[in-house]
Amino acid sequence: MVLVLCDASHGVAACTSFGTPTKLPISLPLNLPILDQFRPPSCKWCSGNRGIEYRTVPGSVVFAAASGIVTFVGSVAGTNYVVIKTNETLKTGNNLLVTHGRLRSVSVKSGDLIAADQTIGGAGESLYIGVRENGQYTDPQQCASLGSTGKPRAVLVAG
């Protein structure tokens, strides 16, 4: 059993286990340029970037960054999102959510069981990936790990 401790100042969690960074089963698209890094807000309602935004080729296939169950599919302020409650939640009891945003199209629905690498939609001009653990935002790059092959599991390909 792994105990994950989070520094929840300003609604931002740090993935640590007894002070050591903890890698979670989340894979990020290592083949895409980052447009906007994670920038924690200075207060709960302040501006910042609660995830990472990647440059994409519009229409590219978007694969799930984690395995789990889809808990939300919809448009927020004109932007399509897919939220996955990861299988890690069952293992640790921590509520770990991965948000995929700025999607042009979505090919899953709420309640679907998703495997890492499964197609969840098509990319827009960019792709947003955010991570929340027990309601606290955390830097996806601090928590992401590679698959057992050492290769990224979430990649985009021209569709």
Where are these regions (language model features)?
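Short, solvent-exposed loop/turn positions at domain surfaces
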Residues: 56-58, 102, 108
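C-terminal segment of classical bacterial N-terminal signal peptides
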Residues: 2-10
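Short glycine/threonine/proline-enriched tight-turn/helix- or strand-capping micro-motif at secondary-structure
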Residues: 32-65
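Short, well-structured beta-strand-loop connectors
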Residues: 61-70, 107-123
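Acidic, glycine-rich catalytic/binding loops that coordinate metals and/or anionic ligands
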Residues: 15-29, 48, 55, 109-115, ...
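Solvent-exposed coil/turn segments that connect beta secondary-structure elements
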Residues: 39, 59, 67, 75, ...
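Zn2+-dependent peptidoglycan hydrolase active-site motif and core
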Residues: 65-105, 125-131
